[in-house]
Structure formats: structure tokens, C-alpha cells
Amino acid sequence: MKIIVQKFGGTSVKDDKGRKLALGHIKEAISEGYKVVVVVSAMGRKGDPYATDSLLGLLYGDQSAISPREQDLLLSCGETISSVVFTSMLLDNGVKAAALTGAQAGFLTNDQHTNAKIIEMKPERLFSVLANHDAVVVAGFQGATEKGDTTTIGRGGSDTSAAALGAAVDAEYIDIFTDVEGVMTADPRVVENAKPLPVVTYTEICNLAYQGAKVISPRAVEIAMQAKVPIRVRSTYSNDKGTLVTSHHSSKVGSDVFERLITGIAHVKDVTQFKVPAKIGQYNVQTEVFKAMANAGISVDFFNITPSEIVYTVAGNKTETAQRILMDMGYDPMVTRNCAKVSAVGAGIMGVPGVTSKIVSALSEKEIPILQSADSHTTIWVLVHEADMVPAVNALHEVFELSK
């Protein structure tokens, strides 16, 4: 049985126009001899009646007494409704289709409600239904515990659902349909001449996603990479095959992946930088501070440690809490709000001299101050003022000639 997984997000399934475009992609796959496992998100975005955020808004405020287990019962409804509506549309258009919930499709998760982890896939029922249908529509974002409690698997969960299904059924491709032409060299809303990339590696797309590119969930990429199932990031509104995400840039197995220096530029805004000076005679400031942040549920990013101070960033909405904790501990932090993290990602930078110099020079020419920097084997990050984010992203996109 030749299987393809196709995932359609909220904007693709929110109305009849989007669903009909999705229908075209499904029929094309069927005509190519595939059985199609369709994964759908809830219909629309916040403000639309069945979107996840809209359902969450039905609860009585942020401090609702409802348990996470009960929240999952509510949150999973959006995808369940979407799967049935989508299946009805397929049937009305001559596609032999059936709908399954995440649990029915074999998603077994732990009991970490609202952010559950998939611990096993049991696709036997899915295979059975697929044998007698052209397409099976699976509600994304959801699963169930061994006790049968409904769970949801966190933000980006429908991407993760598609990847887990692709791995479980040994799909030829996992198609992630979005509203753009594939993985872009930068956010096209920030860089007008951003270009779609024909091929990226799993590592590159993971890094782009973790650094702010919202085209696909990094959890989904990690699952597909482990199973060695290629992903295609495609546009719902086009017949183009989009961006292929695989283990290497070239179709030639064993070829070098370093022919492209920088793959893309990503960014994250609304970041706050903290500089925490060490107390006199104190040598473990980072241990004390990071432990306090973790205990408060604050994720620490982009940190540098010196004998005299530690520097790190937090999400903007955690600023007040983080500052209060530090002051209660007797520290007097220097706080810089309204920052942005700009990242240059590419497998080709590993061991190549001059890349950081090129970034520094490009930003200096635009008179953009760098507040902090760091690097890894495949990514170089800089922290800038948020007001400088757009010119910084454009400067790096230009200096690495990503529009060519």
C-alpha cells in the first residue's frame, strides 16, 4: 500500500474555498496511486468559532478552576469537528473517506494534559480503515492515555500528528500545507524579496523553526528525521511541490551538504535581556539564578556567563516576573526590554571562517548595535533592539545573497 500523509492547517480548512483547494491536492494524490492519510487542524484561527483559542476562550478567565484533563476534552473538539466536516466534503465530491479521532488512529500519549507526549503509535485500525477507503481524515493535535482520557499534544500539534502518522505508516511523503510556497529564506512579511527554498535539511528546518520561523513545528521535523520520512512544505493555493525537507540537499546520496553557506534568516521579537552582576565573592550566580527561573516556569535563552555577570533573555511576557524574582534574591539586574533575536541558519557555516565577521559588518553598516551574540555549528544569533529587527533581517538576507 503506497501511503502519503497530507496535513491541512486551520486557514486551509476554515471555509469551503480552502477545503475545495485541499480536495484538489487529495484527488491528485489518489490519482497517483496513493492512499491518503489526511490530518486536519481546527477550523480557522482565534475569533473563528471552532478554532482552538476560541474554544479556550469559552472558559471563565485565565484562572478557571477546570482541570487540564477537562481542558483537553474541550480543546480536542475543534479538530474532531473539522475532521467530520472535511470528511463530509470528501464524500460529497466522490472520495471514499472516513474520519477517525486521534485516539482511534492510534495515538497513545502520556497524561501530561494540554502538552502530552506521544509514547506509542498503534495504527492497526488506521490500516484497516485505509484498506477500504481512498482517504482517512484524522483529527490532529489529539490522542489518548492508556486509561482512555483524551489528551492534546501542544502548539503545533497537528504538524506533530502528521509526522507521527507518517512514521507509523511508513509514508512516502508527509505533506504540510500552509499559506506560503514552502520554506522561505526569511519571513516574506519582513523581507519582500524572500525566496522559497527547493530543498532544506532536517537540521536546518529544525533550527529555523526553533529560531522563530513558524512554517512547521520542530517536534514534527524531529519525528520525521528519526523515521527518515521526507517532508514537503507546500502551499494549499498552488500545485507546486514546495520545499523538500530531507537528510541532504542533493538527490545524490552521500553528497556534501555544505554547498550553501546560509539557508535562511529567522527572528523572534518581544524578547527581554537581563544582565545580572555577581555578588562580591559569589561564584555560582548562574546556578542560583537559573534554578529560580526554572522553578517559576520561565524559559531562559541566549545566555552568556562570565566571572562577573550572567546575561540571558526571556520572553517579553515573563519580564516582570523574572525581574521581581531577581530583586527578591538581592540582585540588581540591568533590564533591556523590546529586543529581538535574529538568527542566520545554515549547515554550511560549520568551520567556515569569516561568517560572524560578515554578520557584524553588515549590521554595523546599517548602524545596528549588537546587544549580544552566540553561535553553534549551524546557527549564529544576534540580539538587537526590536526597532532594528526588520533592517537587521534584511541586512543579513542581503549580505548572504539569499534572494538570488
Curated annotation (Swiss-Prot):
Pathway(s) the chain acts in: Amino-acid biosynthesis; L-lysine biosynthesis via DAP pathway; (S)-tetrahydrodipicolinate from L-aspartate: step 1/4; Amino-acid biosynthesis; L-methionine biosynthesis via de novo pathway; L-homoserine from L-aspartate: step 1/3; Amino-acid biosynthesis; L-threonine biosynthesis; L-threonine from L-aspartate: step 1/5
Binding site for substrate: 25-30, 52-54, 79, 130-131, 155-158, 299-301, 355-356, 369-370, 376-377
SUPFAM superfamilies: ACT-like (SSF55021), Carbamate kinase-like (SSF53633)
GO biological process, one term: threonine biosynthetic process
Tree of life domain: Bacteria
Record GO cellular component, one term: cytosol
EC number in record: 2.7.2.4
Enzyme class, UniProt record, top EC level: transferase
Reaction it catalyzes: L-aspartate + ATP = 4-phospho-L-aspartate + ADP
ACT domain segment(s): 344-404
Keywords: Amino-acid biosynthesis, ATP-binding, Diaminopimelate biosynthesis, Kinase, Lysine biosynthesis, Nucleotide-binding, Transferase
Gene3D superfamilies per record: Acetylglutamate kinase-like, VC0802-like
Protein name as it appears in the record: Aspartokinase 1
